[in-house]
Amino acid sequence: MATTYEEFSAKLDRLDEEFNRKMQEQNAKFFADKPDESTLSPEMKEHYEKFERMIREHTEKFNKKMHEHSEHFKQKFAELLEQQKAAQYPSK
């Protein structure tokens, strides 16, 4: 059975969403393990804030890159479908 562009695109979108959700869940678990701020020294509080910001930024960048790759794969898949169509039905 041949895969349509819509099926391929939907599957990539679903995988992107699932991966993003899992990353957010992992981050939430990590952030939940943070000690109570009232017990932290100012230096450690600053350290945790920087680390959390870094994790959020890297997660955002990674998800953006994953989305870009998915869009690239969708484009390539569409091109392959066009090539296949042109090979099956060459114009006279």
Curated annotation (Swiss-Prot):
Pfam families, sorted: KMP11 (PF03037)
Predominant location: cytoplasm
Keywords: Calcium, Cell projection, Cilium, Cytoplasm, Cytoskeleton, Flagellum, Microtubule
GO cellular component, one term: motile cilium
Coiled-coil annotated spans: none
InterPro entries: KMP11
Gene Ontology BP annotations: cytoskeleton organization; defense response; positive regulation of cell population proliferation
Localization per Swiss-Prot or TrEMBL: Cytoplasm, Cytoskeleton; Cell projection, Cilium, Flagellum
Role summary: May be involved in the regulation of the cytoskeleton through interaction with the subpellicular microtubules. May be involved in parasite mobility and attachment to the surface of the host cell. Behaves as a strong immunogen during infection.
Record's miscellaneous remark: Binds calcium.
Subunit comment: Monomer.
Family classification: Belongs to the KMP-11 family.
Annotated protein name in UniProt: Kinetoplastid membrane protein 11C
Organism name: Leishmania infantum
Gene it is expressed from: KMP-11C
